[in-house]
Amino acid sequence: MITNKAIQKKPEHKQMMQLQSWYEPALRTLEGLLEIRRANLRKVKGDEKNAAVTRDEFMEMLMNEHRVSAWYAGEIISSLLRVGQIFMFGRFIQMNEEVGEL
């Protein structure tokens, strides 16, 4: 597990590179969660574009699947939001469709 101390001792560019290396696995995890939501919406004849997951649920999946700390999962989500890979409204997260899916 990655700890706060281990990350904070590295130079800033190394921290950013390490954080960016988590983009693809995190987006794959998010896509899997969104696919479940889309399937649920299809069952009830809902609009699949409304599929979204909560920030807490996404963080929990990152912690369980990729064994990162809660703090680091939050950093990954914040970084994805800053670069425009995801769209957040309130506590819900969607993929940014302009960027494209995996």
Report each predicted region and the residues it spans.
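Surface-exposed polar/charged interaction patches
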Residues: L33-I36, N40, E65, V83
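Eukaryotic partner-binding/assembly regions in large regulatory complexes
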Residues: M1-K5, V44-E48, V68
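A short, conserved structural fragment
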Residues: L81-R91
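Short, cationic-aromatic polyanion-contact patches
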Residues: D56, R91-L102
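Long, low-complexity, charged/polar intrinsically disordered regions in eukaryotic proteins
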Residues: M1-R38
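Short acidic, hydrophobic short linear motifs in intrinsically disordered regions
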Residues: R42-M61
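Short amphipathic alpha-helical interaction segments
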Residues: R67-S79
